[in-house]
UniProtKB/Swiss-Prot annotation:
Secretion signal span: none
Pfam families documented for this protein: C6_DPF (PF10170)
Gene: CDPF1
Lineage: Eukaryota, Metazoa, Chordata, Craniata, Vertebrata
Cysteines engaged in disulfide bonds, as pairs: none
PANTHER family the UniProt entry points to: CYSTEINE-RICH DPF MOTIF DOMAIN-CONTAINING PROTEIN 1, CYSTEINE-RICH PDF MOTIF DOMAIN-CONTAINING PROTEIN 1
Name the UniProt record assigns to this protein: Cysteine-rich DPF motif domain-containing protein 1
Matches recorded under InterPro entries: CDPF1 (IPR042426), CDPF1_dom (IPR018785)
Assigned protein family: Belongs to the CDPF1 family.
Length: 121
C-alpha cells in the first residue's frame, strides 16, 4: 500500500489558456524515482495514473519562457522549441521561429494568423 505522501499532490496545475486542471506531484527538472531523466525545462509533473511503476510520470505543463503564463503541453496551448512557448507568444513572434515551426503551426487546428508582412499575395 502506498504511503499517504505519495497520494497527496503538491498542488493543482491550471493552464491559463485552456483551463485544464490536473494535480501535480512534482515541480522541477528531475522527477523523483526517475534517476536517469532530466527534463529540459522546469515542469509540472504528475505520476502516471495508468501504471503502478513509481518511475513513470506525465508532464502536465510549464511556464511560457516569454510571458510566464502557466500553459499545458497540449498542441492547442504551447509548443516546445528549446524552451516552452505559449501559442499567443509564438504568434506574436512567429518570424523569430524557423520555417519548420511556422509550417507546423499552420497545420494545427488552432487558428493561426501570419503577420501581414509574411502573407503570400
Amino acid at each position: 500500500m502506498a504511503c499517504e505522501t505519495e497520494r497527496t499532490p503538491l498542488g493543482v496545475f491550471k493552464c491559463q489558456l485552456c483551463a485544464l486542471t490536473a494535480p501535480y506531484s512534482y515541480q522541477g527538472r528531475q522527477p523523483p524515482d526517475s534517476q536517469s531523466v532530466v527534463l529540459l525545462e522546469e515542469s509540472y509533473v504528475m505520476r502516471d495514473p495508468f501504471t503502478p511503476d513509481k518511475g513513470r510520470f506525465l508532464v502536465v505543463g510549464s511556464r511560457c519562457s516569454m510571458c510566464g503564463r502557466l500553459v499545458c503541453v497540449g498542441p492547442e496551448c504551447s509548443l516546445f522549441y528549446s524552451k516552452r512557448f505559449c501559442l499567443p507568444c509564438v504568434q506574436d513572434n512567429v518570424d523569430a521561429f524557423p520555417q519548420e515551426i511556422q509550417q507546423d503551426l499552420e497545420k494545427r487546428k488552432v487558428p493561426f494568423t501570419r503577420p501581414a508582412s509574411q502573407r503570400s499575395s
